[in-house]
C-alpha cells in the first residue's frame, strides 16, 4: 500500500497524507487550499471525492494484492472551506473473492468544525466497490 501511495502523484500534489492504516482500513488527511475552492467559496466536490478515493485505495490495497476501484459514489452532506483540514476514514464492509465494499467518511477537523455535540462535522459519505486484479480459484474460502 505504501508503494502505491508513494507513486500516486495526484494525491501527493494535493498534499494528501496517510495518517493511519490497518487491515481493511486507512485514514488520510488533506488541507483545503485556495486552489480547491469552487465558485460558491466551498471545497470543490471533486477534491473531496479524490481524498475519499485515496483513503479507499489504501484500505482496499492493505491486504497485499493489487486492487482497483470497480465503482464509487459520494454523497455531499455539508460544505468544507478553505483552510479546513479534512480527514477521510475508510473501513472495509465486506470482501469476498475479488470483490470488496468500503465506506469512507470525510469530516472537517479544522478549528470550529465540530458540531453542537463537539464531534467532527461530516462533510461527505463515500462508498467504493473494489476489484482485486488477481484471479480467485473456484472453491476458495472467502477472505
Located regions from the model:
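Hydrophobic residues in beta-strands and at strand termini
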Residues: 30-32, 76, 132
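Short, charged/polar surface micro-motifs in flexible loops or helix N-caps
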Residues: 23-24, 33-36, 54-56, 82
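Non-catalytic linker/capping segments at the edges of enzyme domains
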Residues: 1-29, 33-34, 142-143
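Compact, glycine-rich, soluble single-domain proteins
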Residues: 40-57
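Hydrophobic beta-strand-centered segment that forms part of the acyl-chain substrate-binding groove
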Residues: 57-87, 92
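HotDog/MaoC-like acyl-thioester-processing domains
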Residues: 79-82, 91-143
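A short, polar/proline- and glycine-enriched secondary-structure boundary/capping micro-motif
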Residues: 38-41, 135-136
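A generic structural signal for short beta-strands and their flanking turns/coil linkers
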Residues: 12-14, 24-26, 66-72, 84-86, ...
